[in-house]
């Protein structure tokens, strides 16, 4: 499992690095961008390979730090805010993982595979499992931490392709796959199932009321992650891993195609005014539509093999009617926003008739997209053979089997209707813009869990800043140190400007001290009963040598000073 997943990470990373050659070719900091991408992939590899919790934490923390650097790569206020939101949201998961590491040390080691036998017996394992779930839902942006994933689209599109497909958001899913026994054996899976169901439903509705191209794809990532967590909480680990790999393929292709479209139309992302692009960029739009159909679960594409299997398992699972309806309505919403995107790409309005150079990108980007589209068409079948060597045969009544197809058809029809009558709703329904903003902004969850939680700490911080940082703390702290340093520097400056006088004064003082010492040496010796046999002559010799030495140094120093200050001649050496 580890080797297969890390091979997908390296494959998609390689295509993303090829993709950046033409996307940000004129960037001055291109080498820094490549270094960040490689460090990002290395952190993900460190997290995947090692089962030790310390190694997982190193890779986990590296993903959070480097993702902040990548999100703020474009130097603007929007990127800064998105980077701070991404970083602080992931910090919650880091704290939970640190507590988990400290707690599991009670068993004697950080390698969790040694303690799987304690899962059914020890109550403390429930606490560790809860901490793992908290860490995972922050990284995979589940409710209530869903606000950072749509905001992270401020990063360059190659970064979004890597983050949403195989690295940052999938890190939380992979952590749950590795620790699945910690919560599947307990009641924690029921809470995880509820969180995943709400995330699927809210993100599906939000994508249908959103007009930002990259944000729609980001919300679809949120929906697919919820789908993976939902099937994982039921207990089907291999199927969750299967869909994780297939999702990585079509999501990388979706973001690369979206980046090509945005790049060619000068960074404009509103889908309402960039329609009918199939006439100008046929290859890119074809690849984009194939990836969208794979997202819907179109038969014989890679997404079909995993999504159809998940739907059949949900139909046979022992769940209540509320969760059943929530799941199938969310599936219809996925098809709805996917067909909405396809409609705008094929038939929508195009308001850039004055831009004459709109075509498919160069050979390098087309090569990256072609590599993904080939794997997209064949990868589902190949992965099914690798992960499930024995075929899975599910028998169910025809009516229940047709329910999946009916849901997808209804979702596509509703998506087509929404695309055609959005202007009608805007004119006829009262407060339509408010409803669209509420549903498109994920039910104001970003506003509640960013501004709503942080507003009071920020107010208290402002009070502390006024009373401490801008009050007595500043007066007796930094400002007082500054005044002391300034006073000392003035004194040293005075000494430095008068160093010749000071040097001569020190020489004179030293001369007086030696003279007094020699005069009173005989009396000191008599008082201390010393015998003077040639000692006085030695003291006189020492005095004469010191006098000559200071005289020589004084003359040389004076000559150097004169040459430097008056004549501009190089000082004597």
Residue ranges, per PLM feature:
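Core, highly hydrophobic multi-pass alpha-helical transmembrane subunits of bioenergetic inner membranes
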Residues: 1-573
């Amino acid at each position: 499992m580890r080797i297969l997943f890390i091979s997908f990470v390296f494959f998609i990373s390689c295509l993303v690095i090829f993709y950046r050659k033409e996307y940000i070719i004129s960037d001055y900091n291109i080498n820094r961008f490549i270094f960040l991408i490689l460090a990002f992939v290395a952190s993900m590899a460190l997290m995947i390979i090692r089962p030790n919790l310390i190694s997982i934490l190193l890779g986990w923390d590296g993903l959070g730090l480097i993702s902040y650097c990548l999100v703020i790569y474009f130097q603007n206020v929007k990127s800064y805010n998105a980077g701070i939101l991404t970083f602080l949201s992931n910090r919650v998961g880091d704290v939970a993982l640190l507590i988990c590491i400290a707690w599991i040390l009670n068993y004697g080691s950080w390698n969790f595979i040694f303690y799987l036998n304690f899962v059914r017996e020890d109550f403390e394992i429930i606490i560790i499992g809860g901490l793992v779930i908290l860490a995972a839902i922050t990284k995979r942006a589940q409710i209530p931490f869903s606000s950072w994933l749509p905001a992270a689209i401020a990063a360059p599109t190659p970064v979004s392709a890597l983050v949403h497909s195989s690295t940052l958001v999938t890190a939380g899913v992979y952590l749950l796959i590795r620790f699945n026994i910690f919560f599947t054996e307990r009641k924690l899976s029921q809470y995880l199932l509820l969180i995943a169901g709400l995330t699927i439903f809210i993100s599906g509705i939000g994508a249908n009321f959103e007009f930002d191209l990259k944000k729609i794809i980001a919300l679809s990532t949120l929906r697919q992650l919820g789908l993976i967590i939902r099937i994982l909480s039921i207990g089907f680990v291999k199927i969750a891993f299967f869909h994780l790999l297939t999702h990585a393929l079509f999501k990388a292709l979706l973001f690369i195609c979206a980046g090509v479209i945005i790049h060619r139309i000068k960074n404009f992302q509103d889908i309402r005014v960039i329609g009918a692009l199939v006439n100008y960029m046929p290859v890119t739009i074809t690849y984009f539509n194939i990836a969208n159909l794979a997202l819907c679960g179109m038969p014989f594409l890679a997404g079909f093999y995993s999504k159809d299997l998940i739907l059949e398992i949900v139909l046979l699972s022992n769940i209540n009617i509320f969760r059943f309806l929530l799941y199938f309505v969310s599936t219809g919403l996925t098809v709805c926003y996917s067909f909405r995107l396809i409609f705008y790409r094929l038939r929508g309005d195009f308001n850039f008739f004055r831009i004459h150079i709109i075509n498919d990108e160069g050979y390098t980007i087309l090569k990256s997209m072609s590599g993904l589209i080939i794997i997209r068409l064949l990868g589902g079948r190949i992965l099914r053979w690798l992960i499930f060597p024995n075929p899975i045969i599910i028998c169910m009544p025809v009516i229940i089997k047709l329910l999946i197809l009916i849901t997808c058809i209804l979702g596509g029809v509703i998506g087509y209707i929404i695309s055609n009558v959005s202007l009608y709703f805007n004119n006829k329904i009262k407060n339509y813009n408010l409803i669209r903003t509420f549903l498109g902004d994920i039910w104001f969850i970003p506003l509640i869990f960013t501004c709503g939680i942080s507003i009071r700490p920020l107010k208290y911080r402002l009070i502390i800043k006024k009373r401490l940082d801008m009050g007595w703390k500043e007066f007796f702290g930094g400002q007082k140190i500054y005044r002391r340093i300034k006073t000392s520097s003035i004194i040293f400056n005075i000494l430095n400007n008068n160093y010749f006088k000071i040097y001569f004064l020190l020489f004179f003082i030293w001369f007086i001290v030696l003279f007094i010492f020699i005069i009173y040496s005989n009396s000191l010796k008599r008082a201390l009963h010393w015998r003077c046999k040639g000692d006085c002559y030695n003291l006189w010799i020492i005095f004469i040598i010191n006098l000559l030495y200071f005289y020589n140094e004084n003359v040389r120093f004076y000559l150097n000073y004169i040459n430097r200050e008056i004549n501009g001649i190089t000082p004597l050496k």
